[in-house]
UniProtKB/Swiss-Prot annotation:
Family: Belongs to the diacylglycerol/lipid kinase family. YegS lipid kinase subfamily.
PANTHER family recorded: LIPID KINASE YEGS, SPHINGOSINE KINASE
Cofactor note: Binds 1 Mg(2+) ion per subunit. Ca(2+) may be able to substitute.
Enzyme Commission no: 2.7.1.-
GO cellular component, one term: cytoplasm
Presence of keyword Chloroplast: no
Protein known as: Probable lipid kinase YegS-like
Biological source species: Pseudomonas aeruginosa (strain ATCC 15692 / DSM 22644 / CIP 104116 / JCM 14847 / LMG 12228 / 1C / PRS 101 / PAO1)
């Protein structure tokens, strides 16, 4: 492996982004060997990562939104090599990047390649990996049904608008949750199982989550009496509903839902009647800012 070889896996819609081009050029002028590959269709990111690992690249950069980040991170983790991950946030929500303190400006984001990569955890459910968060209930439906065109026009506000227009479809989910020293059963409106802290365009469902603690943060919003009003508050920023959440921090969690539960894994839908969530500690090395809110402690000095 050549420690200086870096490959940017860039979402196809960002191929003409002039800020990205300038940031890449600046890295090259500074002496970094930085190549770029562009995705075109589903599966491209995974294939590009696999080819990059075989070619000896030391670092992969995920250039896109949360979905691109999940694809690259999963492929990198399954490759079981020593290559690290850097993040170039170019999506609508950029939930993981925002919570981690990663700059949204391309040049500043790529500058994090100079930071020492830190080992972080990944979440896993029924054989699928996720970097940020699994969401369930009405919030996951909003994320899944927000159109790309609307996100392009409104940015993160698109999730709010989609939620407001789908109030007529609001109904509670039913589930049983089991984990070490934690049991809960009932109807719920929203669910977050977080390695990271926020999802759905800035909704902070797991405010104390860390990506290097070997735990998943569980946040359940039980169905309130004023369901529509509470949901409106949640979609509008969440102020005033904090005290309603049931929370836990666990190494694993089993969820049973007799009618099935729709879950969103960083943009990828999953449905099941029985889901088991667990943590893969230190599964991936990621270039994060010094003092990132998602890290427990500073890196050890060598």
């Amino acid at each position: 492996m050549d420690k200086d070889k870096v490959l940017l896996v860039l979402h196809g819609k960002q191929a003409g982004n002039e800020e990205v081009r300038a940031a890449v050029a600046a890295q090259r002028e500074a002496g970094r060997e930085l190549a770029v590959r562009v995705t075109w269709e589903d599966g491209d990111a995974r294939r590009i990562v696999e080819e990059a690992l075989a070619a000896g690249y030391a670092t992969l950069v995920a250039g896109g939104g949360d979905g691109t980040l999940r694809e690259v991170a999963e492929a990198l983790a399954r490759g079981r090599g020593e290559a690290s991950l850097a993040i170039l946030p170019l999506g609508t929500a950029n939930d993981f990047a925002r919570a981690a303190g990663i700059p949204l400006e391309p040049a500043a984001a790529l500058a994090l390649l100079d930071q020492t990569a830190r080992p972080i955890d990944l979440g896993e459910v029924n054989g699928k990996l996720f970097l940020n968060m699994a969401t369930g209930g009405f919030g996951s439906k909003v994320t899944a049904n927000t159109s790309e065109d609307l996100k392009k026009v409104l940015g993160g506000a698109a999730y709010l608008l989609t939620g407001l227009t789908r109030f007529s479809e609001v109904h509670a989910a039913q589930g049983r949750f089991s984990a070490p020293d934690f049991q809960w059963e009932g109807e719920f409106l929203a669910l977050g199982i977080g390695n990271g802290r926020q999802a759905g365009g800035g909704h902070v469902l797991c405010p104390q989550a860390r990506v290097d603690d070997g735990l998943l943060d569980v946040s359940i919003l039980p169905t309130p009496q004023d369901m529509v009003g509470t949901l409106g508050t949640l979609l509008g920023g969440g102020n005033g509903v904090e005290s309603l959440f049931v929370r836990a921090r666990v190494p694993w969690l089993e969820v049973e839902a007799a009618e099935g539960l729709d879950v969103n894994l960083d943009g990828e839908p999953l449905e099941g009647r029985k889901l088991r969530f667990s943590v893969s500690p230190g599964a991936l090395r990621v270039h994060l800012p010094a003092g990132s809110p998602l890290l427990r402690e500073p890196p050890r000095e060598d």
